[in-house]
């Protein structure tokens, strides 16, 4: 990395150093050792908790002792993805970087700017002798990428700060002040196997080609849910014919809107052509309903060999009614930030596992009570259908506070420096900030960062000019922090 071309030099110096240290999620020992050694070399107090989270403290510069204590926070792990032709060893090899125009990239791997640039910014501030600031604490958390492990493990009393600035956002000029918490509600229908009538018409029906997407970021975009569309058609068949259901399968990940779903069914042979007509009519209906958001939607219906066994009729009836009734999509919009989803639910997957039909749903909200309410709505729909239902403990959200004092400082600073107002946003997905707020409810927070693109992939890149703007803004915020 040619540091001379990069500004601010100190930030890119430490980013280059961090790139030399392997730091996959759950294998952060080397970067932890680097950070502890850095603190010792700088003569700064450093504490490490049982999870591996590190807190490095730096006293206020002269004349700034009366400012509130600021916690700068990043996570130290990175997503390790590489191209198929790369021989990179993430446990031992440094990340090789190069400059492409205004972008910093890595050779065939993830760059690790998520969240290495946050770390580098913290280290540059901790090492600086010419930056004014009040009392500082720099929090470095472990294993954010695979489960927010460090944030979950953080104990009360580990930090003393009043204000927390998360450095893990990916769009310069945008300030985030809220995120969703979440929980999964897991449903199980027990069923009995019954003999399937062998003289019936057996067929597989499938819904495919849907856009899908993230169950938080994309839940408000009116994209179709393959499980919902499939169940709607199966319900029509069950209402018209002597209907048997042999198999059902849809969706995969709890945090993804399902793109495909299929079922293996049977009806009397005399209704073979009726079912095909029903399918054509239904396909035209849903193509019309989702003409904008689902241009590649398609259905398939094909003959299959007879199944020996089917799901008992009572369970099928209760299953189809429950899947029809359960909420999917936006449940409530934020009253603090127009256009932001506050609460939602995702009907994520329907699987047949170990003699049971297992359904996974995911609820999100920036308000804990609303998330619990959403989970109870889902629970009620399935309990009415006779299923066993369990909801996970989940993780907390971060309710937006547009009146935040540190947000006002950040907005005023940005306008003063760059002549435009930053965008204030919240995200309908999980961030570490929600967990911090649960244990330190007094914290005044916002999240910021330079522009990154292609994160979590070998296409990850960082916009070099954005780093300089992010740096200048952060330093100006630090010197204008409210007094104690």
Name what the model sees in each region.
Residues 76-78, 139-147, 169-172, 211, ...:
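Acidic, glycine-rich active-site loops and adjacent beta-strand->loop/helix elements
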Residues 64-146, 151-162, 202, 316, ...:
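Active-site metal-coordination/substrate-binding segment of hydrolases
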Residues 16-20, 262-264, 298-309, 348, ...:
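A short beta-alpha structural unit
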């Amino acid at each position: 990395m040619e540091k001379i071309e990069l500004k601010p030099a100190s930030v890119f110096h430490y980013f280059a150093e961090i790139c030399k240290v392997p730091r996959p999620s759950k294998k952060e020992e080397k970067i932890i050792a680097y950070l502890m050694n850095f603190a010792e070399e700088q003569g700064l107090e450093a504490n490490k908790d049982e999870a591996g989270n590190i807190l490095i403290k730096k006293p206020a510069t002269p004349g700034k002792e009366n400012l509130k204590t600021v916690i700068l926070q990043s996570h130290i792990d990175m997503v390790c993805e590489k191209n198929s032709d790369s021989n990179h060893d993430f446990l031992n090899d440094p990340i090789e970087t190069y400059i492409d125009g205004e972008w910093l990239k890595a050779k065939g791997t993830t760059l690790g700017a998520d969240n290495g640039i946050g770390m580098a910014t913290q280290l540059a501030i901790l090492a600086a002798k010419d930056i004014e600031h009040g009392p500082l604490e720099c929090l470095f958390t472990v294993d954010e990428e695979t489960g927010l492990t460090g944030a979950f493990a953080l104990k009360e009393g580990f930090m003393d700060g009043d204000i927390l600035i998360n450095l893990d956002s990916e769009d310069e000029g945008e300030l985030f002040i809220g995120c969703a918490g979440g929980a999964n509600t897991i449903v199980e229908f027990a069923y009995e196997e019954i003999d399937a009538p062998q003289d019936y018409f057996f067929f597989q029906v499938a819904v495919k080609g849907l856009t899908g997407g993230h169950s938080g970021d994309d839940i408000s975009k009116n994209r179709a849910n393959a499980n919902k569309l499939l169940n709607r058609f199966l319900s029509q068949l069950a209402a018209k014919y002597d209907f048997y259901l042999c198999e059902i399968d849809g969706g995969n990940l709890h945090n993804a809107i399902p793109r495909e779903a299929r079922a293996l069914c049977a009806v009397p042979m005399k209704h073979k052509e009726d079912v095909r007509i029903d399918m054509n009519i239904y396909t035209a209906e849903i193509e019309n309903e989702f003409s904008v958001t689902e241009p590649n939607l398609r259905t398939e219906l094909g003959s299959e060999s007879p199944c020996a066994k089917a799901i008992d009729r009572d369970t099928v009836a209760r299953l189809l009614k429950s899947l029809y009734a359960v909420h999917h999509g936006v449940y409530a919009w934020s009253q603090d930030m127009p256009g932001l989803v506050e609460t939602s639910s995702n009907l994520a997957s329907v699987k047949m596992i170990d003699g049971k039909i297992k359904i996974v749903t995911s609820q999100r909200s920036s308000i804990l009570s609303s998330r619990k309410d959403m989970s109870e709505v889902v629970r009620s729909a399935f309990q009415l259908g006779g299923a066993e239902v369990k909801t996970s403990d989940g993780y907390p959200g971060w309710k937006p506070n547009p009146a935040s004092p540190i947000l006002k400082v950040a907005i005023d600073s940005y306008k003063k420096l760059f002549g435009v107002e930053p965008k204030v946003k919240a995200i309908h997905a999980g961030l570490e900030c929600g967990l911090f707020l649960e244990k330190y409810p007094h914290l005044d927070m916002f999240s910021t960062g330079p522009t990154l693109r292609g994160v979590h992939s070998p296409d990850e890149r960082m916009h070099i000019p954005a780093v300089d703007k992010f740096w200048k803004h952060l330093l100006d915020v630090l010197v204008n922090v409210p007094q104690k």
